[in-house]
Amino acid sequence: MKLSVSLSDDDVAILDAYVKRAGLPSRSAGLQHAIRVLRYPTLEDDYANAWQEWSAAGDTDAWEQTVGDGVGDAPR
């Protein structure tokens, strides 16, 4: 679907800067990313809460033993 929007010069500059910084191919890709973020407005807080719950559970030592098995980060 094709959609036309009106944005201020400031908004276009911000969008262009984000597209360039993120290595996205187009303004459309930048807007699509913004819409995906809008779908899950609490996702960042949800991850922060999950991390705090995990940290408070006291499983840090067991996890450190597990990740110390010599396997590094997978290439992305």
From Swiss-Prot:
The record's section on Pfam families has: RHH_1
Concerning what turns on (or off) its expression, the entry says: Mildy induced (5-fold) when grown in a non-replicating state.
Instruction: List the InterPro entries.
Output: CopG
Q: Which CDD domains match?
A: RHH_NikR_HicB-like (cd22231)
What the protein does comes down to: Antitoxin component of a type II toxin-antitoxin (TA) system. Upon expression in E.coli and M.smegmatis neutralizes the effect of cognate toxin MazF9.
Q: How does it assemble?
A: Forms a complex with cognate toxin MazF9.
Report what the protein is called: Antitoxin MazE9
